[in-house]
Amino acid sequence: MNPFPFEELHKILELKDTELEIDELLFTSTIFYIEKILGYPLEDHNYNELQTVRDCKVYTNQDNITEMVNIIDMNTKLRVPHCVIDGRTIFLLDTKLEGHILFLNYNAGFLQSTMPADLKEAIIKLFLLKKKEFIKQQNHEDDCSFEIPKDIQNTLDIYRRKTL
């Protein structure tokens, strides 16, 4: 489920019912655009990975872990019971796991309850800019250039995928 549904945007901005189809299309476009900039989907998804333990830790490929479903030691086929999760880093308490390959099954993304307010604000502002640009194009205005303002870009940079 989308962590920031169109219905919430509709309520916040009090959008006109006569323009709902266009607004929903622009909102979907805005979400896809932001996900492309960030490098990951906003919506919570399930991921499966194989990672090798180095220095008693492994790194997930995804940010914003919402649930660690399972960690299996592929060497012993046993569940790894104790770990500490900090961002994309999983610290393992059992030193015997060093060098082992682990199967990670986890959920990552944003939920409605965990969606950051500043990211929601950036989505709203970008939606309004896209709508303004769309109206200009409909009116055949010459100035239809689109550029993300610095304040929105700064917010998106906070959440942009960082490589390890």
Regions picked out by a protein language model, each given a short descriptive name:
Residues 1-164:
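Divalent metal-cofactor coordination and adjacent catalytic microenvironments
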